[in-house]
Amino acid sequence: MDKKIFGVYLAKDGIPNNEAYAKLKLPASPWELWDAMEKVRLNEGEQLYMEIENYVAFGYLAPYLDGLDISLNELNDLAALLSVLDEVQEAAFEGLFSMEVQRKVNANGGIITLQDLRDLAVSARTDCYHVVEAADDAQLGRFYAENDFVPELEGVSNEVFEMLDFAGIGRMMRCSENGVFVNSLYVLRDGELTTAPPVQKTLPEKPGYLFRLTLGLCPDFGGNRTTVLDLPASEEALAAAQAQLGTLNWENTVVLNLSLIHI
């Protein structure tokens, strides 16, 4: 999870400027989520305050995520969906998002929901759209004209072709297709969106361990005793593992096997 999408500030609702707070970059692993929640120290009945402080490359989502009823786990899931997009797919997502916003506006004030955003993020990895290298109507019009998308231009001479109103052609095509420009790309949706699977509001179950070690004695000490130790471990668990192996010195042990949860 190297690519981070959001930076969030977590605290107790009602007293956000409290010493019990956490800052977290999303997407985060289950361990990171639970570690942040333990820093906030919510008591029974208390609610979580969450503020998105950094949108990285997705600042245009701020007006729509601000005030949206969304939990930490749901926001983390959205961040995970966005984090796997490459540069072109990110542009496609922004284009699909702009189209969806306009569709909602035309539908008399419909709001962008969390499910809308998740569907768009998933769809940005499908073939429901086309992306053309064009930063404005003139470049778009020339692309369509040069690639025979305008039948009326068939057979025109080079001299006449260069005199065409490419900006007008591009504008006409863009308006008829409801496409949008994103930076230096033109995004056109030409298929159905994919529905993202449901996501729960609550955090996943707290992982029981980060590392699971199978330990044995060094060959020099003989014996075939083994024990399993989950890390992080309490002092009691560490002492119990040593007792099982029959040694008080970790230098006398070897790791026979290592497994870990996804972090």
Question: Where does each model-flagged region fall?
Answer:
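N-terminal ordered "arm"
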Residues: M1-Q47, P207-T247
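Acidic, proline/glycine-rich low-complexity IDRs
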Residues: K12, G141-R225
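Intrinsic-disorder-associated interaction segments
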Residues: L26, L68-E74, D86, G110, ...
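An N-terminal, globular interaction/scaffold subdomain
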Residues: W34-L82
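Charge-rich, solvent-exposed alpha-helical interaction surfaces
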Residues: A36, Y64, E74-V84, L96, ...
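N-terminal low-complexity, intrinsically disordered segments
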Residues: L48, N252-S259
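Metal-dependent nuclease catalytic core centered on acidic motifs
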Residues: A79-A138
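Conserved small/polar residues in nucleotide/adenosyl-binding loops
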Residues: I261-I263
